[in-house]
Amino acid sequence: MKLTKNESRMRRKIRIRKKVSGNGARPRLVVYRSNLHIYAQLVDDQTGTTLAATSTLALGKQNGNALRLTVDNASLVGKEIAKLAKEKNIERVVFDRNGYIYHGRIKAVADGAREAGLEF
């Protein structure tokens, strides 16, 4: 039986997570993409805590209007997570694409974070 897109993504995710982990000095920047929003969070895998998180949903609530899931708004999420990281004195991160192909909105989050000063 053929694997669905999501099942393939979950298998890729497991392979990636075997190799990628974050710590306090260099946390993992995890990106999740749903049909309506994109989410990004910084995770310290040694303690199992989320250090910072943001999404198009959270940014939309701050602005008072709903943000649609576009490449431009994904870039805004990247810039916002970089700003939150800078507030916590985090300069370097490990990027976890969460099984998604590094293209489009996922790439836009990474590029936005790099523009705002995060090192991958």
UniProtKB/Swiss-Prot annotation:
Pfam families in UniProt: Ribosomal_L18p
Top-rank lineage group of the source organism: Bacteria
Gene Ontology molecular function: any one: structural constituent of ribosome
One CC-aspect GO term: cytosolic large ribosomal subunit
Gene3D superfamilies: 3.30.420.100
The keyword Ribosomal protein is annotated on this UniProt entry: yes
GO terms for biological process, alphabetical: translation
Keyword vocabulary terms for this entry: Ribonucleoprotein, Ribosomal protein, RNA-binding, rRNA-binding
The protein's role, per its UniProt record: This is one of the proteins that bind and probably mediate the attachment of the 5S RNA into the large ribosomal subunit, where it forms part of the central protuberance.
Classification via PANTHER family: 39S RIBOSOMAL PROTEIN L18, MITOCHONDRIAL, LARGE RIBOSOMAL SUBUNIT PROTEIN UL18M
Self-association state and partner proteins as the record states: Part of the 50S ribosomal subunit; part of the 5S rRNA/L5/L18/L25 subcomplex. Contacts the 5S and 23S rRNAs.
Homology family: Belongs to the universal ribosomal protein uL18 family.
Name this polypeptide is given: Large ribosomal subunit protein uL18
Source organism of this protein record: Oleidesulfovibrio alaskensis (strain ATCC BAA-1058 / DSM 17464 / G20)
